[in-house]
Amino acid sequence: MIDFTLTKKQQELKEGLNQLGRYVIRPMSLEMDKKKDVPETFLRNFMKLSHSFRSEDVNEFTDAAATVNKVRDPSKPSQSNRTAAIGAEELAWADAAMLLCIPGPGLGGPPVRATGTPEQKERFLGMFANMEETELKWGAYGLTEPGAGSDVAAIRTSCRKDGDHWILNGRKCYITNGARAIWTVIFATVDPALGRAGHRTFVVEKGTPGFEIGKIEEKLGLRANETAELVLEDCRVPDANLLGGEEAYASRAGGFMTAMKTFDNTRPLVGAMAVGIGRAAYEYARDFVKENYVLSRPIPRYAAIAERLAKIGRRLEAARSLVYRATYLADMSIPNAKEASMAKAAAGQAAIWACIEAIEICGAHGSLQTEHALLEKWFRDIKVYDIFEGTGNIQRIVISKRILTDLKAF
């Protein structure tokens, strides 16, 4: 039986991040969006704060603790994924772009933890475990290409063996923190004709000859977080950076499964972020109604608005429950691909709908761009949550495949 009750540490984390978001992050949110950057001073102070709350759960959320180098014993239940989801929701409630800027291995962390050799985990994750309080380092995850987004098996970035190195050629696009990452997990193929069986995964370090930063994208939302193009031209990567070593690719889909397993961990967190943005819009619309409508008047006059608020709240609560279920399964080391996709798809759609409804409830006020009315910004930020890490259509395909291959799924 799943218990959704928060532990004392989780409740403290939730309340602390909510206060930080309300009084520190929210007031600078629109300015960060306009300048397309999060001040380094804030990020350094945030890292100091995370170090001052040295607990296993908070370290798991910031992804900067020594424990990230260890493979967790599957027989010992954890709450780290759920704790990360709780933190992600609260920080996305404040500003989702800022959340994506928090130093750490980011999306690059899960594949290194899941399939890296002990030496690779020590080397690449250790860079963050030993990070000083005011030190800023990022990792990144390079999967998407101009011609291969949702269709992961269609990647065309090539890799070929050359002595004790690999030569990589290709382009990666829409890479979160790609320009400032100290290393990026890059997916490539030895032969496109092999499909997923030809995939290989590398950790490519910043400064590697042939590894360059392309353009920084101009975006609809999440503008304070950079999204970059990465270019590999005869990029020489040592054998030691082949994730998991040669033996990891003995199966026909080793590299492909690395990508899929990453999504099983990260999609629930994307769902949690979407819930945070949707909740922000919902609460703003709710408070707007309280302040601007005389609700003591006959109910029929305001029933339509009240009903809309009720539907928003209901959908967001349902989405959060799916997120918690997916993270519970991850913490128990139980396969959760179906539940991760359900959580991500439901949360993204619920939050997009919540932002649209909130703007309509607030009328013209909802379309304003002011530091006190962030609905316009949240509306721009939320759309990508139904796109990245697998579009809504892809999530439905994943869900349907799991249901049809396991008729006892429900």
Question: What does each of the following model-derived ranges do?
Answer:
Residues 169-213:
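A short core secondary-structure module
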Residues 2-13, 76, 212-317, 385, ...:
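Glycine-rich beta->alpha junctions and the first turn(s) of the following alpha-helix
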Residues 2-3, 87, 107, 119, ...:
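Glycine-rich phosphate/cofactor-binding loops in nucleotide/flavin-utilizing enzymes
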Residues 1-102, 123, 134, 403-410:
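Amphipathic, small/basic residue-rich leader segments at the start of a protein or domain
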